[in-house]
Amino acid sequence: MKLKLFLLSVLLLVSGSSQAQRIKDIANVQGVRSNQLIGYGLVVGLPGTGEKTTYTEQTFKTMLKNFGINLPDNLRPKIKNVAVVAVHAEMPAFIKPGQTLDVTVSSLGEAKSLRGGTLLQTFLKGVDGNVYAIAQGSMVVSGFSAEGLDGSKVIQNTPTVGRIPNGGIVERTVTTPFSTGDHLTFNLRRADFSTAKRLADAINELLGPGMARPLDAASVQVSAPRDVSQRVSFLATLENIQVEPASESAKVIVNSRTGTIVVGREVRLLPAAVTHGGLTVTIAEATQVSQPNPLAGGQTVVTADTTIDVAEEDSRMFLFNPGTTLDELVRAVNLVGAAPSDVLAILEALKMAGALHGELIII
């Protein structure tokens, strides 16, 4: 049986010339960033979907002790409506004390569901160990689970993860270098020497020579006013300057799992001839029983009956001329009706032969 060939769907990055973009769309201000917070807490009020692990009991006892209630060490509280959870949030830049954060709550143990639970006061710490926010409140859980007495179970989405909108209150700010020093630095989201130079040139054209200088392929340093009150308007002006990013390097990106192929507009091919055929080998094995004559005195044996079928597809050769564009490449590949796996093999062979001018990236 011959292999069925499917039409390859190729995504093409074929935009014409690069278009100018605002600095705020291609770069970030160094030091102006969000920070991750994490904490460990208890969710209570669960309808029998909690857990009874040792660390859950220890955490529960510690919480009661903080409220002045001391339980005997040998007492194991029977709790089914409590779960230990990890609480995490993203703390945006410039957020002030008293403002709120959305927090995500995830079960750490064997709780079946967090639906209907309430998170008790939990400290959210940064990487430096300091407390920056406090989270508490009722959770929104989109998933649910149900289990019958016979062991049957239905689970939709993820019932062990929930969110608390505005459930975290900021208690401390994170200092940034935005208001200190004599310079501001723009970091490109995609490092490129040409783009870094163009960004510096665009700023110097507006502010004057020497105001901006590229430090490397990803960073451009700009002289900034020392007066902090002027920096906001200064940066607001800079981030709206139009810059034309440099063209991307020639790349072919292949997702071997989904068969998606993205071809950059700068990809070119040198002269090459390609032929690709498929060989299908089918092996079928069945067992048969060999029964001897009743008077022969032999033994019954099981024998294997193996059938091997080999089928080879007819393949066609196609030729790439000098300077072949990606459009011609796609047409040629679609012409032979190659499947994604076949196209990947062709691209790898072209790269090994030195005929593919571009970086081949397989993800």
Swiss-Prot record:
Which is an annotated GO molecular function term of this record? structural molecule activity
Q: Which GO terms describe its biological process?
A: bacterial-type flagellum-dependent cell motility
Q: What keywords are assigned to this protein?
A: Bacterial flagellum, Periplasm, Signal
The superkingdom listed in its UniProt entry is: Bacteria
Q: Does the keyword Protein transport apply?
A: no
Q: Name one GO cellular component term.
A: outer membrane-bounded periplasmic space
> Which residues constitute the signal peptide according to the record?
1-20
Question: Where does the UniProt annotation locate this protein?
Answer: Periplasm; Bacterial flagellum basal body
Q: Per the annotation, which location comes first and is thus the protein's main one?
A: periplasm
- Pfam family for this entry, one: FlgI
Per UniProt, subunit arrangement is:
The basal body constitutes a major portion of the flagellar organelle and consists of four rings (L,P,S, and M) mounted on a central rod.
Q: Family assignment?
A: Belongs to the FlgI family.
Function per UniProt? Assembles around the rod to form the L-ring and probably protects the motor/basal body from shearing forces during rotation.
Q: What is this protein called?
A: Flagellar P-ring protein
Lineage of the species this protein comes from = Bacteria, Pseudomonadati, Pseudomonadota, Gammaproteobacteria, Alteromonadales
Supply the gene name: flgI
